[in-house]
């Protein structure tokens, strides 16, 4: 079997409760939602997938990948195996040294999920008042990527 892309949830929890997400519903994730995949288990899964033609790993699922404080280490594992590391995130934690570590680890694609075009619509959809912070994080990350050549 040929598997060129894998979506691997390294973190089950989320720091948002977006209107459109099943995780935000009562009982949406149950008790296991706080679990994180260990680095060892992740590397074992990647080792197995590489032999099937793996080219891209999406480090997300229903959980928020940036809640995993070792996200940069997961990216490094993907890169060591010759694949690309993609992520979708609400962007709330992508700032400062954490953001730089994730970028410098070799992230190939990082999408900020911003539902709403101003603080009011963002709040209505994402149940968060962090619109300005997330926009600032996005702009800072863009500058860092451009300035560092990452």
Region spans (language model):
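Conserved alpha-helical substructure of the radical SAM core
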Residues: 1-109, 120, 124-125, 129-132, ...
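The feature captures the short pre-catalytic strand/loop hairpin that immediately precedes
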Residues: 116
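Short, intrinsically disordered, charge-balanced linker/junction segments flanking boundaries
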Residues: 144-150
């Amino acid at each position: 079997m040929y598997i060129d892309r894998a979506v691997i949830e390294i973190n089950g929890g989320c720091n948002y409760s977006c209107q459109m997400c099943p995780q935000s519903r009562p009982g949406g994730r149950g008790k296991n939602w706080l679990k994180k995949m260990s680095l060892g288990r992740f590397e074992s899964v990647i080792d197995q997938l590489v032999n099937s033609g793996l080219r891209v790993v999406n480090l997300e699922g229903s959980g928020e990948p940036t809640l995993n404080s070792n996200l940069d280490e997961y990216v490094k594992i993907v890169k060591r195996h010759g694949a690309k590391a993609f992520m979708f995130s609400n962007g709330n934690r992508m700032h400062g040294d954490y953001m730089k570590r994730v970028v410098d680890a070799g992230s190939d694609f990082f999408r900020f999920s911003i539902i709403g075009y101003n603080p009011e619509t963002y709040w209505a959809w994402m149940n968060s008042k962090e619109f300005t912070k997330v926009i600032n994080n996005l702009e800072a990350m863009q500058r860092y990527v451009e300035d560092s050549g990452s």
